Amino acid sequence: MTLLKNDTFLRALLKQPVEYTPIWMMRQAGRYLPEYKATRAKAGSFLDLCKNTGLATEVTIQPLERFDLDAAILFSDILTVPDAMGLGLYFAEGEGPKFAHALQHESDIAKLHVPDMEKLQYVFDAVTSIRKALDGRVPLIGFSGSPFTLACYMVEGGGSKEFRTIKTMMYSRPDLLYKILDTNAQAVTAYLNAQIDAGAQAVQIFDTWGGVLSDAAFKEFSLKYIRQIVAGLKRESEGRRVPVIVFAKGGGLWLESMVQIGADALGLDWTCNIGEARRRVGNQVALQGNFDPSALFGTPESIRTEVARILTGYGHGSGHVFNLGHGINQHADPEHAKILVDTVHELSRQYHGG
Protein backbone atom coordinates (compact mmCIF):
# COMPACT_ATOMS: atom_id res chain seq x y z
CA MET A 1 0.00 0.00 0.00
CA THR A 2 1.14 3.56 -0.73
CA LEU A 3 2.83 5.50 2.05
CA LEU A 4 0.60 8.17 3.64
CA LYS A 5 1.66 11.69 2.69
CA ASN A 6 -0.56 13.25 5.39
CA ASP A 7 -1.22 11.19 8.53
CA THR A 8 -2.12 14.16 10.77
CA PHE A 9 -5.67 12.85 11.26
CA LEU A 10 -4.48 9.41 12.44
CA ARG A 11 -1.86 10.93 14.75
CA ALA A 12 -4.40 13.30 16.33
CA LEU A 13 -6.77 10.38 17.01
CA LEU A 14 -3.95 8.63 18.88
CA LYS A 15 -3.06 11.85 20.76
CA GLN A 16 0.37 11.98 19.11
CA PRO A 17 1.97 15.38 18.36
CA VAL A 18 0.71 17.19 15.26
CA GLU A 19 1.56 20.54 13.63
CA TYR A 20 -2.07 21.67 13.35
CA THR A 21 -5.58 20.40 14.15
CA PRO A 22 -6.79 18.12 11.34
CA ILE A 23 -10.30 18.50 9.92
CA TRP A 24 -12.82 16.47 7.95
CA MET A 25 -16.59 16.99 7.75
CA MET A 26 -19.34 14.49 8.30
CA ARG A 27 -21.22 14.10 5.01
CA GLN A 28 -18.40 15.98 3.22
CA ALA A 29 -19.36 14.19 0.00
CA GLY A 30 -22.95 15.32 -0.33
CA ARG A 31 -25.72 17.41 -1.81
CA TYR A 32 -24.20 20.79 -0.91
CA LEU A 33 -21.64 20.17 -3.70
CA PRO A 34 -22.84 20.76 -7.29
CA GLU A 35 -20.35 18.15 -8.55
CA TYR A 36 -21.90 15.57 -6.20
CA LYS A 37 -25.37 16.34 -7.58
CA ALA A 38 -24.06 15.87 -11.13
CA THR A 39 -22.54 12.47 -10.31
CA ARG A 40 -25.65 11.42 -8.39
CA ALA A 41 -27.79 12.29 -11.44
CA LYS A 42 -25.46 10.17 -13.58
CA ALA A 43 -25.85 7.22 -11.18
CA GLY A 44 -29.66 7.29 -11.27
CA SER A 45 -30.46 6.73 -7.60
CA PHE A 46 -28.70 7.08 -4.26
CA LEU A 47 -28.41 3.30 -3.88
CA ASP A 48 -27.05 2.95 -7.42
CA LEU A 49 -24.43 5.54 -6.52
CA CYS A 50 -23.42 3.55 -3.42
CA LYS A 51 -23.19 0.33 -5.45
CA ASN A 52 -21.22 1.75 -8.40
CA THR A 53 -17.53 1.45 -7.44
CA GLY A 54 -16.32 4.07 -9.90
CA LEU A 55 -18.94 6.67 -9.00
CA ALA A 56 -18.67 6.03 -5.22
CA THR A 57 -14.92 6.63 -5.59
CA GLU A 58 -15.56 9.80 -7.59
CA VAL A 59 -17.87 11.36 -4.99
CA THR A 60 -15.57 10.38 -2.10
CA ILE A 61 -12.68 12.25 -3.76
CA GLN A 62 -14.71 15.33 -4.83
CA PRO A 63 -14.52 17.26 -1.52
CA LEU A 64 -10.73 16.69 -1.38
CA GLU A 65 -10.37 18.42 -4.75
CA ARG A 66 -12.18 21.45 -3.38
CA PHE A 67 -11.00 21.63 0.25
CA ASP A 68 -7.74 20.90 2.06
CA LEU A 69 -9.26 18.10 4.15
CA ASP A 70 -7.16 15.74 6.28
CA ALA A 71 -9.24 12.59 5.73
CA ALA A 72 -11.62 11.03 3.22
CA ILE A 73 -14.66 9.04 4.31
CA LEU A 74 -16.09 6.15 2.34
CA PHE A 75 -19.22 7.13 0.43
CA SER A 76 -21.92 4.70 1.50
CA ASP A 77 -24.90 4.52 3.85
CA ILE A 78 -25.37 3.02 7.31
CA LEU A 79 -28.39 1.06 6.07
CA THR A 80 -26.40 -1.17 3.70
CA VAL A 81 -26.09 -3.71 6.57
CA PRO A 82 -29.83 -4.26 7.23
CA ASP A 83 -30.36 -4.21 3.46
CA ALA A 84 -27.94 -7.17 3.21
CA MET A 85 -30.05 -8.89 5.89
CA GLY A 86 -32.94 -8.91 3.42
CA LEU A 87 -35.01 -5.99 4.77
CA GLY A 88 -35.43 -4.40 1.33
CA LEU A 89 -33.99 -0.88 1.58
CA TYR A 90 -35.47 1.74 -0.73
CA PHE A 91 -35.58 5.53 -0.79
CA ALA A 92 -38.97 7.19 -1.14
CA GLU A 93 -38.76 10.57 -2.88
CA GLY A 94 -38.60 13.31 -0.25
CA GLU A 95 -39.16 10.82 2.58
CA GLY A 96 -35.73 9.31 3.18
CA PRO A 97 -34.92 5.62 3.66
CA LYS A 98 -37.59 2.94 4.07
CA PHE A 99 -37.55 -0.82 4.59
CA ALA A 100 -40.03 -3.00 2.71
CA HIS A 101 -39.73 -5.72 5.38
CA ALA A 102 -39.57 -4.00 8.77
CA LEU A 103 -39.06 -6.20 11.85
CA GLN A 104 -42.50 -5.98 13.40
CA HIS A 105 -43.30 -9.62 14.13
CA GLU A 106 -41.55 -12.08 16.38
CA SER A 107 -41.26 -14.54 13.48
CA ASP A 108 -39.32 -11.94 11.41
CA ILE A 109 -36.91 -11.35 14.27
CA ALA A 110 -36.39 -15.10 14.81
CA LYS A 111 -35.23 -15.37 11.17
CA LEU A 112 -32.80 -12.44 11.42
CA HIS A 113 -29.15 -13.41 10.98
CA VAL A 114 -25.74 -11.90 10.27
CA PRO A 115 -25.58 -11.40 6.50
CA ASP A 116 -22.99 -13.00 4.25
CA MET A 117 -20.39 -10.26 3.79
CA GLU A 118 -20.28 -11.11 0.07
CA LYS A 119 -23.60 -9.25 -0.18
CA LEU A 120 -21.66 -6.12 0.84
CA GLN A 121 -18.73 -6.71 -1.52
CA TYR A 122 -19.64 -3.51 -3.39
CA VAL A 123 -18.73 -1.56 -0.23
CA PHE A 124 -15.36 -3.28 0.15
CA ASP A 125 -14.65 -2.82 -3.56
CA ALA A 126 -15.32 0.90 -3.11
CA VAL A 127 -12.88 1.04 -0.15
CA THR A 128 -10.12 -0.58 -2.23
CA SER A 129 -10.86 1.66 -5.22
CA ILE A 130 -10.87 4.84 -3.08
CA ARG A 131 -7.55 3.90 -1.44
CA LYS A 132 -6.04 3.50 -4.90
CA ALA A 133 -7.45 6.85 -6.07
CA LEU A 134 -6.23 8.61 -2.91
CA ASP A 135 -2.69 7.35 -3.55
CA GLY A 136 -1.64 8.11 0.02
CA ARG A 137 -2.94 11.69 -0.02
CA VAL A 138 -4.93 11.36 3.24
CA PRO A 139 -6.30 8.42 5.26
CA LEU A 140 -9.62 6.78 4.43
CA ILE A 141 -12.31 6.37 7.10
CA GLY A 142 -14.70 3.42 6.99
CA PHE A 143 -17.94 3.51 8.96
CA SER A 144 -21.11 1.83 10.12
CA GLY A 145 -24.22 2.65 12.09
CA SER A 146 -24.43 1.47 15.70
CA PRO A 147 -26.59 -1.58 16.53
CA PHE A 148 -29.28 0.58 18.18
CA THR A 149 -29.39 3.19 15.41
CA LEU A 150 -29.70 0.44 12.78
CA ALA A 151 -32.43 -1.22 14.88
CA CYS A 152 -34.43 2.04 14.92
CA TYR A 153 -34.75 1.94 11.13
CA MET A 154 -35.22 -1.85 11.02
CA VAL A 155 -38.09 -1.82 13.54
CA GLU A 156 -39.73 1.49 12.60
CA GLY A 157 -39.41 0.71 8.88
CA GLY A 158 -37.79 4.09 8.24
CA GLY A 159 -36.98 7.33 10.02
CA SER A 160 -39.05 8.39 13.04
CA LYS A 161 -39.70 11.41 15.22
CA GLU A 162 -40.82 9.60 18.38
CA PHE A 163 -39.55 6.00 17.94
CA ARG A 164 -42.78 4.62 19.34
CA THR A 165 -42.47 1.15 17.77
CA ILE A 166 -38.93 0.43 18.91
CA LYS A 167 -39.51 1.92 22.37
CA THR A 168 -42.65 -0.19 22.76
CA MET A 169 -40.55 -3.26 21.94
CA MET A 170 -37.78 -2.11 24.30
CA TYR A 171 -40.11 -1.78 27.28
CA SER A 172 -42.55 -4.63 26.55
CA ARG A 173 -40.42 -7.27 24.76
CA PRO A 174 -36.77 -6.44 25.45
CA ASP A 175 -35.84 -10.05 24.56
CA LEU A 176 -36.74 -9.32 20.92
CA LEU A 177 -34.69 -6.14 20.85
CA TYR A 178 -31.70 -7.92 22.43
CA LYS A 179 -31.81 -10.43 19.58
CA ILE A 180 -31.82 -7.66 16.95
CA LEU A 181 -29.03 -5.73 18.71
CA ASP A 182 -26.81 -8.77 19.15
CA THR A 183 -27.25 -9.72 15.48
CA ASN A 184 -26.48 -6.13 14.46
CA ALA A 185 -23.38 -6.01 16.67
CA GLN A 186 -22.01 -9.20 15.12
CA ALA A 187 -22.81 -7.93 11.62
CA VAL A 188 -21.23 -4.50 12.20
CA THR A 189 -18.07 -6.07 13.65
CA ALA A 190 -17.65 -8.28 10.57
CA TYR A 191 -18.54 -5.37 8.26
CA LEU A 192 -16.01 -2.95 9.76
CA ASN A 193 -13.29 -5.60 9.88
CA ALA A 194 -13.90 -6.30 6.18
CA GLN A 195 -13.61 -2.54 5.48
CA ILE A 196 -10.29 -2.52 7.37
CA ASP A 197 -9.09 -5.53 5.34
CA ALA A 198 -10.07 -3.67 2.16
CA GLY A 199 -8.01 -0.63 3.20
CA ALA A 200 -9.93 1.57 5.69
CA GLN A 201 -7.35 3.27 7.95
CA ALA A 202 -9.79 4.40 10.68
CA VAL A 203 -13.43 3.54 11.39
CA GLN A 204 -16.33 5.48 12.86
CA ILE A 205 -19.46 4.06 14.49
CA PHE A 206 -22.44 6.43 14.13
CA ASP A 207 -24.97 6.22 16.95
CA THR A 208 -27.33 8.79 15.50
CA TRP A 209 -30.33 7.88 17.66
CA GLY A 210 -28.75 6.79 20.97
CA GLY A 211 -29.56 10.24 22.34
CA VAL A 212 -33.32 9.53 22.31
CA LEU A 213 -32.89 6.97 25.11
CA SER A 214 -33.07 7.35 28.88
CA ASP A 215 -29.83 7.07 30.84
CA ALA A 216 -30.35 3.42 31.79
CA ALA A 217 -31.64 2.46 28.33
CA PHE A 218 -28.69 4.10 26.54
CA LYS A 219 -26.24 2.04 28.57
CA GLU A 220 -28.20 -1.20 28.18
CA PHE A 221 -29.45 -0.99 24.59
CA SER A 222 -26.81 1.11 22.86
CA LEU A 223 -23.49 1.43 24.65
CA LYS A 224 -23.25 -2.23 25.62
CA TYR A 225 -23.43 -3.30 21.97
CA ILE A 226 -21.01 -0.62 20.75
CA ARG A 227 -18.55 -1.92 23.34
CA GLN A 228 -19.06 -5.43 21.91
CA ILE A 229 -18.13 -4.16 18.43
CA VAL A 230 -15.08 -2.19 19.58
CA ALA A 231 -13.78 -5.29 21.41
CA GLY A 232 -14.05 -7.32 18.20
CA LEU A 233 -12.42 -4.88 15.78
CA LYS A 234 -9.02 -5.31 14.15
CA ARG A 235 -6.89 -2.53 15.60
CA GLU A 236 -3.76 -3.04 13.48
CA SER A 237 -3.45 -3.03 9.70
CA GLU A 238 -0.60 -2.29 7.32
CA GLY A 239 1.76 -1.96 10.28
CA ARG A 240 -0.12 0.80 12.09
CA ARG A 241 -3.01 1.21 14.51
CA VAL A 242 -6.51 1.57 13.09
CA PRO A 243 -8.24 4.15 15.34
CA VAL A 244 -11.90 3.75 16.26
CA ILE A 245 -14.19 6.79 16.65
CA VAL A 246 -17.60 6.52 18.32
CA PHE A 247 -20.06 9.34 17.62
CA ALA A 248 -23.31 9.37 19.59
CA LYS A 249 -25.51 12.33 18.66
CA GLY A 250 -26.97 13.68 21.89
CA GLY A 251 -24.44 11.56 23.79
CA GLY A 252 -22.72 14.36 25.69
CA LEU A 253 -24.39 13.24 28.93
CA TRP A 254 -22.58 9.91 28.78
CA LEU A 255 -18.97 10.84 27.98
CA GLU A 256 -17.61 9.24 31.16
CA SER A 257 -19.36 5.96 30.33
CA MET A 258 -18.33 6.14 26.67
CA VAL A 259 -14.66 6.50 27.63
CA GLN A 260 -14.88 2.97 29.06
CA ILE A 261 -15.78 1.22 25.79
CA GLY A 262 -12.27 1.14 24.37
CA ALA A 263 -12.57 3.56 21.43
CA ASP A 264 -9.66 5.86 20.55
CA ALA A 265 -11.87 8.92 20.05
CA LEU A 266 -15.35 10.18 20.85
CA GLY A 267 -17.31 12.43 18.50
CA LEU A 268 -19.16 15.38 20.04
CA ASP A 269 -22.28 17.02 18.69
CA TRP A 270 -22.56 20.82 18.71
CA THR A 271 -24.44 20.98 22.03
CA CYS A 272 -21.33 20.03 24.04
CA ASN A 273 -18.73 22.42 25.39
CA ILE A 274 -15.51 20.89 24.04
CA GLY A 275 -13.34 22.29 26.85
CA GLU A 276 -15.60 20.75 29.49
CA ALA A 277 -15.69 17.51 27.50
CA ARG A 278 -11.88 17.42 27.48
CA ARG A 279 -11.78 17.92 31.24
CA ARG A 280 -14.35 15.15 31.73
CA VAL A 281 -12.53 12.54 29.63
CA GLY A 282 -9.04 13.55 30.77
CA ASN A 283 -6.32 12.12 28.61
CA GLN A 284 -8.13 8.84 27.94
CA VAL A 285 -9.50 9.50 24.45
CA ALA A 286 -9.22 12.00 21.61
CA LEU A 287 -12.22 14.21 20.82
CA GLN A 288 -13.76 14.98 17.44
CA GLY A 289 -16.03 17.93 16.70
CA ASN A 290 -17.98 20.02 17.20
CA PHE A 291 -18.84 22.99 14.96
CA ASP A 292 -22.60 23.53 14.61
CA PRO A 293 -23.39 22.72 10.93
CA SER A 294 -25.86 25.64 10.94
CA ALA A 295 -23.02 28.06 11.74
CA LEU A 296 -21.96 27.63 8.10
CA PHE A 297 -25.00 29.78 7.26
CA GLY A 298 -23.28 32.70 9.01
CA THR A 299 -20.80 35.20 7.58
CA PRO A 300 -17.12 34.46 6.89
CA GLU A 301 -16.33 36.49 10.03
CA SER A 302 -18.78 34.57 12.22
CA ILE A 303 -17.41 31.25 10.92
CA ARG A 304 -13.87 32.32 11.86
CA THR A 305 -15.06 33.45 15.30
CA GLU A 306 -16.77 30.12 15.93
CA VAL A 307 -13.70 28.14 14.82
CA ALA A 308 -11.52 30.23 17.15
CA ARG A 309 -13.94 29.63 20.03
CA ILE A 310 -13.81 25.84 19.60
CA LEU A 311 -10.02 25.74 19.20
CA THR A 312 -9.57 27.92 22.29
CA GLY A 313 -12.06 25.76 24.17
CA TYR A 314 -10.09 22.59 23.44
CA GLY A 315 -6.81 24.32 24.19
CA HIS A 316 -3.21 23.28 23.62
CA GLY A 317 -1.96 19.87 22.61
CA SER A 318 -3.00 17.00 20.38
CA GLY A 319 -6.06 14.78 20.62
CA HIS A 320 -8.53 17.02 18.74
CA VAL A 321 -9.90 16.32 15.27
CA PHE A 322 -12.02 19.25 14.09
CA ASN A 323 -15.37 18.29 12.59
CA LEU A 324 -18.98 19.37 12.47
CA GLY A 325 -21.29 18.32 15.29
CA HIS A 326 -23.43 16.48 12.70
CA GLY A 327 -23.52 16.11 8.91
CA ILE A 328 -23.13 19.20 6.72
CA ASN A 329 -26.46 20.69 5.66
CA GLN A 330 -27.39 20.22 2.00
CA HIS A 331 -28.00 23.98 1.69
CA ALA A 332 -24.54 24.98 2.99
CA ASP A 333 -22.39 27.18 0.73
CA PRO A 334 -19.25 25.28 -0.37
CA GLU A 335 -17.31 28.56 -0.13
CA HIS A 336 -18.20 28.75 3.55
CA ALA A 337 -17.03 25.16 4.03
CA LYS A 338 -13.70 26.20 2.48
CA ILE A 339 -13.43 29.11 4.93
CA LEU A 340 -14.05 26.65 7.77
CA VAL A 341 -11.34 24.21 6.65
CA ASP A 342 -8.72 26.89 5.94
CA THR A 343 -9.44 28.72 9.20
CA VAL A 344 -9.00 25.55 11.26
CA HIS A 345 -5.59 24.96 9.69
CA GLU A 346 -4.55 28.59 10.06
CA LEU A 347 -5.70 29.24 13.64
CA SER A 348 -4.83 25.85 15.15
CA ARG A 349 -1.05 25.96 14.64
CA GLN A 350 -0.62 28.13 17.73
CA TYR A 351 -2.01 25.29 19.88
CA HIS A 352 0.56 22.74 18.71
CA GLY A 353 4.33 22.39 19.08
CA GLY A 354 6.69 24.78 20.80
Swiss-Prot record:
E.C. code: 4.1.1.37
Catalytic activity: uroporphyrinogen III + 4 H(+) = coproporphyrinogen III + 4 CO2
GO MF annotation terms: uroporphyrinogen decarboxylase activity
Site label Transition state stabilizer, positions: D77
Coiled coil (residue ranges): none
Localization terms from the record: Cytoplasm
Binding annotation for substrate: R27, Q28, A29, G30, R31, D77, Y153, T208, H326
Family matches, as InterPro entries: UROD/MetE-like_sf, Uroporphyrinogen_deCO2ase_HemE, Uroporphyrinogen_deCOase
Principal localisation: cytoplasm
Annotated GO biological process: protoporphyrinogen IX biosynthetic process from glutamate
Keyword Cytoplasm on entry: yes
Source taxon at top rank: Bacteria
Keyword Cell membrane belongs to the record: no
Pathway connected to this protein: Porphyrin-containing compound metabolism; protoporphyrin-IX biosynthesis; coproporphyrinogen-III from 5-aminolevulinate: step 4/4
Enzyme class, broadest EC rank: lyase
UniProt KW keywords: Cytoplasm, Decarboxylase, Lyase, Porphyrin biosynthesis
GO cellular component terms listed in the entry, alphabetical order: cytosol
Family: Belongs to the uroporphyrinogen decarboxylase family.
Function, as annotated: Catalyzes the decarboxylation of four acetate groups of uroporphyrinogen-III to yield coproporphyrinogen-III.
Complex formation: Homodimer.
Record-given protein name: Uroporphyrinogen decarboxylase
Naturally occurring in which organism (per UniProt): Neisseria gonorrhoeae (strain NCCP11945)
Name of the coding gene: hemE
